Swiss-Prot record, chain B:
Entry comment on modification after translation: Phosphorylation at Thr-147 enhances NADPH oxidase activity by promoting NCF1/p47-phox binding. Ubiquitinated at Lys-149 likely by RNF145.
Organism per entry: Bos taurus
Intramembrane segments: 70-80
GO molecular function, one term: SH3 domain binding
Protein name: Cytochrome b-245 light chain
One Pfam family per UniProt: Cytochrom_B558a
Assigned protein family: Belongs to the p22phox family.
Cytoplasmic side: 2-7, 54-69, 81-86, 127-191
A single GO cellular-component term on record: endosome
Subunit note: Component of the phagocyte NADPH oxidase core complex/cytochrome b558 complex, composed of CYBB (heavy chain (beta)) and CYBA (light chain (alpha)). Component of the phagocyte NADPH oxidase complex composed of an obligatory core heterodimer formed by the membrane proteins CYBA and CYBB and the cytosolic regulatory subunits NCF1/p47-phox, NCF2/p67-phox, NCF4/p40-phox and the small GTPase RAC1 or RAC2. Interacts with NCF1 (via SH3 domain). Interacts with SH3PXD2A. Interacts with DUOX1, DUOX2 and TPO. Interacts with NOX4; this interaction mediates superoxide generation.
Covalent S-S links between cysteines: none
GO biological process terms on file: cytochrome complex assembly; establishment of localization in cell; inflammatory response; innate immune response; mucus secretion; positive regulation of defense response to bacterium; positive regulation of interleukin-6 production; positive regulation of mucus secretion
């Protein structure tokens, strides 16, 4: 019962290491940015005005930068499929990391939601502090236009504020539609709202550019008879103001003076002239740059302007000197770092979508459509230049059924050098598959087995996207593999079996344990022919133990059943009842001492969890089980 | 698109908005903002929305995942009958609850989210959806011996069930009185 540390490390170790690296990156970024805004001299005055809210908002923003850029990478599926197949990633351990790409995407998503909450709360407090702690000394630093300005105005009339509110609403829609319950019941809602991510990224780019004057110049209509002239002036100014702030300054000098405050881009600014104006210095004109929590009129008095460092001799030496300011502090907005963070992954993702679009533009030619028992339809087709490895899946798109929906199906037969046909098995569960089946097989002939080619002139146009990788491709790279399938989950293994039927020698696999659990005896007929032919082939080649088949019928009503008269090899391998996994694992461990066995499961979650637990357990034969899993929905 | 059940999504949104309202309300009352009583109101409204929305309604097709421990609240929500069944009422209730919280900065986002949820509920109501409680399935007690209808009438070895059920279709000449066919005639006289 003990967890074998070797097995655990092999199964979970690399995954947890990557999680740890990601977590420490986030913590490091948060901490560094927090300290920068808390203690950095260039943010001294800003920090005095805003307090803790500034540090929290900027620190969470840097974590958001990292996660918004990382979250796109696991979704570049073509790139991941390429990495899986190429020799550039030689180690099986790193290839297994790619199985967890969806989980990583979800982790980044949840982090974005949490830190957005922190960021929004901190900025709301900042908005409040901007209005309460308005300082006339540093007009450039204020986001508010006058003291006690309503913070809600700051929120809705500045570009960062408005884009921020819109982004929160988009994130809210995306997040509520991505819960497990919605994905399982109404996948459409999840899919359509998740495509709003593009709007989110566009708003994010605008949010950090922070061009404040874009909105405040729209408010510039003063009197009715000059309104038209000024409005047109403002709008042309708005368009050019991004490039020529100086020009705008000239126009607006005789207009409202508060407008000059918002000349510079960005709401949060840093001080540029630290050498000539160290923070906390004394201005000989009487303006006092320290202790801003004192009311403004008190700070005018010169005798209070000595730094507080005199009373504490053990403070830093810079406080014991009275610093004289050479000049007024100058502030400048930061360059929007977020553009650097997200431009790379966003361009990569867009390039990949474009490539997928171009690649899937040509429709496939459907060769045959077969109807199998238990609501399964097999489609065989050909397409030019289509290459796939066993275990990969494709996405089908049929405009006659639905213009917007795409559905993934695992390939059950891959194209080889000699044969360009490939096929999928579809189980008819929802409305898309039902409508698709009605288009492929006219209702009158749905009982018959195979539709002759002559009647197939009116097949609908079908487009495929892919192939995309999945963990099952690895089953050919282990010396011994255990493949467990539940119901229609047998499809990835069917392509593996088809490949072995073609030629088994080039692969590393030398023994395959194939366990297939079904509820209905007729389901076994989907691949009964394939299994029998494979069995006979290995028998002829004198390798009868290459494929070990066990079929389980999990639900029975007491009547003795067989698959079919001609499938004797399968009938003798049919068991009634659920498999006993522990005994199976013990038997495999005993027969393959000291080897590494790859465990693959495509079926219900309960089986998957049991197998995962058993793979981490100790056994006395020195056999290691490595667990590989595909996560659906 | 035709078979989407909007109510489920609206339910998730309303639950999330309730939580956002509670958080915003806590920040407002703890920070002693001006108009902090609106913060207290928003906490109360958030709690009410969360309690109302916690039990998930049953889907019209397929099985629904229950939230953890929702059966107690399902009983309470079921008591209100048509008030909670009808989604029009829920839509307007949420809209009404959301409006006062919009006047305070800390709870403005909760208002926006709850307003969106109320809009989706309105859409669900227009499409005729209704809230129906998820009833717990009655536990089927396994009856001991329930499948044994009749004890076997012959000693072993017994032929399989199919052969046992076809005594009348056998060719004439088989002795009636049991499906057992004796390979040799048996009589009980001792000679």
């Amino acid at each position: 019962m003990a967890v074998s540390w070797r097995s655990w490390l092999a199964n979970e170790g690399v995954k947890h290491l990557c999680l740890l690296i990601w977590l420490s990156l986030n913590v490091l970024l948060f901490w560094k940015t927090f300290l920068l805004y808390n203690q950095g001299p260039e943010y001294h005055y800003l920090h005095e005005m805003l307090g803790l809210g500034l540090c929290l908002s900027r620190a969470s923003a840097s974590v958001l930068n990292l996660n918004c850029s990382l979250i796109l990478l696991p979704m570049c599926r073509t790139l991941l499929a390429f990495l899986r197949g190429s020799q550039k990633v030689p180690s099986r351990r790193t290839r297994r990391l790619l199985d967890k790409s969806r989980t990583f995407h979800i982790t980044c998503g949840v982090t974005i939601c949490i830190f957005s909450g922190v960021h929004v709360a901190a900025h709301l407090v900042n908005a409040l502090n901007f209005s309460v702690n308005y300082r006339e000394d540093f007009v450039e630093l204020n986001a508010a236009r006058y003291r006690e300005e309503d913070p809600r105005k700051l929120l809705f009339t500045t570009v960062p504020g408005l884009t921020g509110v819109c982004m929160v609403l988009v994130l809210f829609l995306m997040f509520t539609a991505s819960t497990y319950a919605i994905r399982v019941s109404n996948y459409d809602i999840f899919w359509y709202t998740h495509n709003l991510f593009f709007v989110f990224y566009m708003l994010l780019m605008l949010h950090v550019s922070g061009s404040v004057q874009l909105l405040s110049c729209v408010q510039l209509s003063v009197t009715p008879w000059t309104a038209a002239r000024q409005a047109s002036l403002s709008i042309t100014n708005c368009l050019s103001c991004l490039h020529h702030p100086v020009v705008l300054h000239q126009y607006q000098r005789n207009e409202h003076s508060f407008f000059t405050n918002t000349m510079k881009r960005g709401l949060l600014k840093y001080q540029t002239n630290l050498d000539t104006h160290p923070p906390g210095c004394i201005n000989l004109n009487g303006t006092h740059y320290q202790n801003t929590h004192l009311p403004e009129h008190l700070s005018e008095h010169f005798h209070e302007s000595f730094p507080g460092g005199f009373s504490k001799p053990d403070e830093l030496t810079q406080n014991t000197f009275v610093k004289i300011c050479m000049e007024e502090p100058r502030f400048q907005a930061n360059f929007p770092q977020t553009w650097l963070w997200i431009s790379g992954p966003l361009c990569l993702y867009c390039a990949e979508r474009l490539y997928r679009c171009i690649r899937s533009n040509k429709p496939v030619t459907i060769i045959s459509v077969t109807s199998h028992p238990s609501d399964v339809v097999e489609i065989r087709m050909v397409k030019e230049n289509f290459k796939a490895r066993p275990g990969q899946y494709i996405i089908l798109h049929c405009p006659s059924v639905s213009a917007l929906e795409n559905h993934p199906f695992t390939l059950t037969m891959c194209p080889t050098e000699t044969k360009a046909t490939f096929g999928v098995h579809l189980k008819i569960v929802g409305d898309w598959t039902e409508r698709f089946r009605d288009l492929l097989l006219p209702p009158s002939s749905q009982d018959s087995e195979i539709l002759p080619f002559i009647q197939s002139r009116n097949y609908p146009k079908l487009y495929i996207d892919g192939p995309f990788g999945s963990p099952f491709e690895e089953s050919l790279n282990y010396e011994v593999s255990l493949c467990v399938a539940g119901g229609i989950g047998v499809t990835p293994f069917a392509s593996i079996l088809n490949t072995l039927l073609d030629d088994w020698k080039p692969y590393k696999l030398r023994r395959l344990y194939f366990i297939w659990v079904c509820r209905d005896i007729q389901s076994f007929r989907w691949f009964a022919d394939l299994l029998c032919v494979l069995y006979n082939k290995f028998w002829q080649e004198n390798r009868p133990d290459y494929v070990n088949i066990q079929l389980y019928l999990s639900q029975t009503d007491g009547i003795q059943k067989i698959i079919g008269e001609k499938y004797q090899a399968l009938n003798s391998r049919l068991f009634i009842g659920r498999p006993r996994w522990k005994l199976l694992f013990d038997e495999i461990a005993k027969c393959n001492r000291g080897k590494t066995v790859g465990v693959f499961c495509c079926g219900p979650n309960s089986i998957s969890k049991t197998l995962h637990k058993l793979s981490n357990r100790n056994n006395s034969y020195g056999t290691r089980f490595e667990y590989n899993k595909e996560s659906f929905s | 698109m035709g078979q989407i059940e909007w109510a489920m999504w609206a339910n998730e949104q309303a639950l999330a908005s309730g939580l956002i309202l509670i958080t915003g309300g806590i920040v407002a009352t703890a920070g002693q903002f001006t108009q902090w009583y609106l913060g207290a109101y928003s906490i109360a409204a958030g709690v009410l929305v969360c309690l109302l929305e916690y039990p998930r309604g049953k889907r019209s097709k397929g099985s629904t995942m229950e939230r953890c421990g929702q059966k107690y609240l399902t009983r309470v929500v079921k008591l209100f009958g048509p008030l909670t069944r009808n989604y029009y009422i829920r839509a307007f209730l949420h809209l009404g609850l959301a409006v006062p919280a919009g006047f305070l900065l800390a709870t403005i986002l909760g208002t926006a989210c709850l307003a969106i949820a109320s809009g989706i509920y309105l859409l669900a109501a227009i499409r005729g959806e209704q809230w129906s409680p998820i009833e717990p399935k009655p536990k089927e007690r396994p009856q001991i011996g329930g499948t044994i209808k009749q004890p076997p009438s012959n000693p072993p070895p017994r032929p399989p069930a199919e052969a046992r059920k076809k005594p009348s279709e056998e060719a004439a000449g088989v002795p009636t009185g049991g499906p057992q066919e004796n390979p040799m005639p048996v009589n009980d006289e001792v000679v």
